[in-house]
């Protein structure tokens, strides 16, 4: 035994630098992070390893056995899962398991359509529509407002993280999505054609469609204990690539109410973006630390 408290986060690439901050702040901690096969491994002081080892992705029993082995080998005291949470919560493990919310709540937070529905009728609610296939998507796009000043549509996977699968549907060059893919712009008929093509190969994941928000983004890094927000930092992402970070923000009361609504616990992140009319619309709650929390710590 090392005499230190040993904490393990699973499958969180951005958590490795966060873990380094934790160790620097408290020398009684050892922090480990398991990452995906595609992620880079960090050289100490935080140890990283492949999450799940060589197991097949759908081997649930094998994954739990691997987790038990890692807990034993590394003498883990606290396991903080950021993936496969329902599976982990259902198992009996030889250490403490920390979750940022109940499993039913996490299922809502991970579902962009259900999450948006939780705030229907409220000022910061972002209207979010569900497309379960190309026919749904075509109907939504055909009925989308086209008058001047109306925001165009954007699409995302119903369940997804890190902005994967986000596209703005716009009247752009047919090559725009190939020549400048980082701007995430594609013609609506090209996106719809791609969805139809994918359907010929098999079932597709649900898509959500919502108005595009010009921004800027405002990201709240939150420390909470169940229903109470203890501390936060708000990061406004500027167009220059820099961030403006404050510890007091006009949205503070709203964010505190969201923490209470979902009984959030630990370090989580609330993500807003400004609409054309200046309102801050709630995009999502990430029930895990955001990578940008390291910037807030520096100030």
Language-model regions: role of each:
Residues 41-44, 59-62, 107-114, 163-165, ...:
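Short, charged, surface-exposed secondary-structure boundary motifs
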Residues 270:
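Catalytic phosphate/metal-binding cores of nucleic-acid and nucleotide-processing enzymes, i.e., regions
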Residues 106-206:
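Active-site nucleotide/adenylate-binding loops and adjacent lid/helix of ATP-dependent enzymes
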Residues 179-258, 262-263, 273-281:
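Phosphate-binding site of ATP-dependent enzymes
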Residues 1-101:
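ATP-binding N-terminal substructure of ATP-dependent carboxylate-amine bond-forming enzymes
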Residues 163, 236-243, 286-298:
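Glycine-rich phosphate/pyrophosphate-binding beta-alpha loops
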């Amino acid at each position: 035994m090392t005499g230190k408290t040993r904490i393990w986060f699973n499958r969180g690439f951005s958590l490795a630098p966060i873990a380094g901050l934790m160790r620097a702040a408290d020398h009684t901690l050892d922090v480990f992070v398991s990452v995906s096969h595609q992620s880079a491994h960090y050289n100490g002081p935080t140890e990283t390893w492949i999450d799940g080892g060589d197991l097949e992705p759908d081997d649930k029993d094998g994954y739990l056995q691997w987790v038990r082995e890692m807990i034993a080998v590394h003498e883990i005291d606290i396991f903080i899962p950021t993936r496969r949470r329902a599976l982990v919560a259902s198992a009996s493990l030889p250490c403490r398991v920390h979750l940022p919310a109940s499993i039913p709540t996490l299922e809502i937070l991970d579902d962009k359509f259900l999450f948006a529905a939780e705030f229907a009728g409220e000022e910061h609610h972002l209207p979010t529509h569900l497309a379960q296939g190309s026919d749904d998507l075509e109907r939504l796009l055909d009925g989308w407002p086209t008058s001047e000043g109306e925001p165009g549509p954007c699409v995302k996977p119903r369940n997804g993280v890190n902005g994967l699968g986000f596209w703005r549907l716009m009247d752009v060059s047919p090559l725009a999505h190939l020549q400048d893919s980082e701007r995430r712009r594609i013609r609506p008929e090209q996106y719809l054609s791609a969805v139809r093509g994918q359907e010929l190969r098999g079932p597709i994941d649900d898509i959500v469609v919502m108005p595009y928000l010009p921004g800027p983004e405002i990201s709240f890094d939150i420390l909470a204990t169940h229903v109470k927000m203890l501390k936060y930092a708000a990061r406004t992402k500027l167009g220059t690539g820099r961030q403006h970070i404050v510890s007091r923000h006009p949205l503070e009361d709203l964010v505190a109410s969201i923490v209470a609504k979902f009984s959030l616990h630990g370090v989580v992140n609330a993500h807003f973006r400004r609409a054309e009319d200046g309102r801050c619309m709630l995009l999502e709650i990430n029930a895990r630390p955001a990578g940008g929390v390291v910037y807030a710590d520096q100030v």
